[in-house]
A protein has these predicted regions:
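Extracytoplasmic copper-binding redox domains, predominantly the cupredoxin/blue-copper superfamily
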Residues: 2, 7-178
Length: 178
């Protein structure tokens, strides 16, 4: 075997090992916290807006010692709510999370995902996750047009998609610094 063949085979083998190990190491989940004021008069997600790549796992953590919360996708299959996630995406509902409990969901379909806390939607406890970027992801889906039957306070709490894409995350919850 000559030197050139040996180097070529070694390079191919090294590349295969590196590629395999890159896929074997999963990125840790990104966290969205559920919070509330000490007396419970205000509740929110932190961050309220988050930009992620397709295939990212989100971990919702209830950090509110005085309340149970949910992380629920807006979708007709869940309490007949309007669909505010991409059409090909699978809806999710964490069920009630007690303080300290967590729930994870992996988002693979590009587009805008709006979610809410079932007991606190009328308090404006909503969040928006943007998966991928428009024009860069096949199958990108903009936010669902129209408010459906969402409370005004919930609609007002969603951060704009462009702000999420520019900043990566938006931290504008009640009681949180902006």
């Amino acid at each position: 075997m000559d030197r050139r063949t040996l180097l070529t085979r070694g390079t191919v083998l090294l590349g295969a090992v590196c590629l395999r190990s890159r896929h074997a190491i999963a990125a840790p989940p990104l966290m969205i916290e559920m919070k509330g004021s000490p007396r419970g008069e205000a509740v929110w997600f932190v961050p309220v807006g988050l930009a992620v790549s397709p295939g990212t796992t989100i971990r919702f953590v209830n950090r509110d010692p005085g309340n149970s919360h949910t992380a629920t996708a807006y979708h007709p299959d869940i309490l007949d709510r309007p669909r505010r996630i991409p059409a090909r995406a699978t809806p999710w509902d964490s069920d009630l999370l007690l303080p300290g409990e967590t729930f994870e969901v992996t988002l693979s379909v590009p587009g805008v995902y709006d979610l809410y806390c079932q007991p606190h939607e009328h308090a404006g406890m909503v969040a928006r996750i943007v998966v991928g970027r428009p024009g860069q992801e096949l199958g990108w889906q903009d936010p669902t047009a129209g408010p459906g039957d969402l409370p005004e306070v919930a609609l007002a709490a969603f951060p704009p998609v462009h702000a999420i894409l520019e900043q990566g995350s938006v931290m504008q919850g009640r009681g949180e610094a902006t």
